[in-house]
Amino acid sequence: MTNKVSKSFIKNSHLITDLKLCIIRLIDNAKFPWIILIPKRKNITDISELNSKDQMLLMKEIVHCSKLMKKIFKTKKLNVEKIGNIVPQLHIHIIARSTKDSTWPLSVWVVKGKPYSKVLLVKTINKIKKYFKD
């Protein structure tokens, strides 16, 4: 039942942790605190393809991660999205937004991303991991 993570995600994101259903990865864009949840199920492209138990678990994990992102990055606004036009593998974006970020109120995709420096990447991953351990 375990799903392999798309090569695109491996190239453009960093592993944070595994939850019961989803793998959590940090998108390599230092402009925005941005994680993706990737369900560990084979050949799934849409939420409706998950069984009802996994649909409920996915919702719980989305809500859990959303609360953590708000707490960690001290934001009041999140973008929670399931798009999948470029990478069809089911994944959910959770992006902490601010009225002060570079594209507010537009989409994060309207500007080119900025990869994390090695130092900031380690710091950000450790910051997020800490909350998953609590």
What are these language model-derived features?
Residues 1-134:
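HIT superfamily nucleotide-processing domains
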